[in-house]
């Protein structure tokens, strides 16, 4: 249960938890009002906050906000709105935006236009939340780089739209994470940390000391979220979470 995850993370020492809006824990369509309240109680009882939420963009229904099918786009936007409502229930300030993907037979120009329209609608629905655009180069093909994020932010141009990035995706592109931090500056609202193969920070090649310094330089005020440990089946989640926490605490 999600409540048990919250208890374990709080016991390790985490300040917050990022909740993915996916089955079995937090898929909006499967959550009763009692289940939502139970998670709220677990957060309060354990002194931990919901830092952010991420819709489940792949698998199942798909939820491609850049789909050529207007019905699929509408369903995807509706899903984001449901997750925005969950953010409000659980006090999460940030909703991540995965910009979808350009499918075979459609142009990049059209896919970009559709994701822009979707982002605009979501941002208008949730002016009280930060909508953080994530470049997902290893998983999709539309918002692939820091330049893409900046272009989409500038185009939609809403005050509650910001940026985020994942160190794993910068590795995939052979880029330097600190370049993203300095380029995005005050527009950087959230960050995912992971090392090679989704290992915990400190286990691979990412220079986290420089990342922390860069975040200080730009006066970053958001959370450091771990997106780790799902690269293989024989993973012990508590061990991954503890190693990530202890390493980051040692360099902050």
Segments (PLM) and residue ranges:
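Hydrophobic faces of well-ordered beta-strands that scaffold small-molecule active sites
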Residues: 17-19, 50-55, 95-97, 131-133, ...
